[in-house]
């Protein structure tokens, strides 16, 4: 249903279409988080990509569209100089097949980061921000609760991105530093597995009260 039709029914969206696109589509968010994010290169869908050119920018890189990757499949986690142009083009065909009708925006090439692991699990946290404050910070990769959390200064730095409700995913690198690895609109971002749902929605309610 279009926004004007919702307004006629006295239904007001917390997040408008422009704000949704700003946080849901990573290249739109990138200008806000690039100081603490992996570097990216963007291409049009089906635009030829020369792997040698990309490798001049990043020694290893991952592939996603403007919203999602195809992790959890047989698609390579990253590409490096061990891949030929022909092999890369084959895998791009696989990528397009796997994403299918869900392809969004274009192709986003992201610098591959070496992430810290604890007992085989990366140390990733998801922060929910609502009305310019962080309302939730939870482990988001199945790691144990004793793993270090992102620096408070970084968490505060991204509490005022131009959207009323969004998420930022943070991950610890091998050297102990932290990076922003993903962002999302709050309405389509999932809660962490062990998160207290009631406490989350209570905090969300209070943020907009």
Model regions and ranges:
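Short, surface-exposed coil-to-beta transition loops
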Residues: 1, 120-125, 165-166
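Active-site nucleotide/adenylate-binding loops and adjacent lid/helix of ATP-dependent enzymes
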Residues: 4-9, 14-123, 131, 135-156, ...
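Protein kinase-like catalytic core scaffold
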Residues: 61, 135, 166, 179-182
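A short glycine-rich, hydrophobically flanked beta-strand micro-motif that places a catalytic Asp/Glu
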Residues: 107-111, 163-174
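Active-site and channel-lining beta-strand-loop segments
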Residues: 125-128, 169-171
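Short acidic-glycine loop/turn motifs at beta-strand connectors
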Residues: 129-133, 174-176
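A conserved acidic, glycine/proline-rich C-terminal tail/linker
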Residues: 154-159, 165
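C-terminal active-site "lid" helix and adjoining low-complexity regulatory extension at the edge
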Residues: 160-163, 172-209
């Amino acid at each position: 249903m279009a926004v004007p039709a919702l307004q006629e029914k006295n239904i007001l969206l917390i997040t408008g279409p422009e704000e949704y696109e700003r946080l849901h589509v990573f290249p739109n968010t990138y200008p806000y988080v690039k100081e603490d994010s992996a570097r990216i290169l963007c291409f049009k869908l089906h635009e030829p990509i020369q792997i040698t050119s990309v490798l001049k920018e990043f020694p290893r890189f991952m592939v996603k569209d403007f919203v999602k990757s195809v992790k959890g499949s047989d698609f390579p986690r990253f590409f490096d100089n061990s891949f030929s142009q022909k092999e890369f083009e084959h895998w791009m065909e696989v990528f397009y097949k796997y994403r299918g009708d869900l392809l969004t925006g274009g192709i986003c090439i992201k610098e591959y980061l070496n992430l810290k692991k604890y007992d085989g699990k990366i140390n990733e946290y998801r922060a929910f921000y609502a009305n310019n404050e962080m309302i939730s910070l939870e482990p988001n990769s199945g790691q144990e609760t004793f793993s270090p959390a992102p620096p408070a200064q970084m968490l505060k730095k991204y509490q005022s991105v131009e959207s009323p409700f969004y998420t930022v995913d943070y991950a610890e690198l091998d050297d102990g530093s932290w990076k922003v690895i993903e962002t999302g609109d709050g309405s389509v971002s999932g809660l962490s597995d062990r998160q207290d749902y009631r406490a989350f929605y209570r905090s969300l309610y209070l943020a907009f009260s």
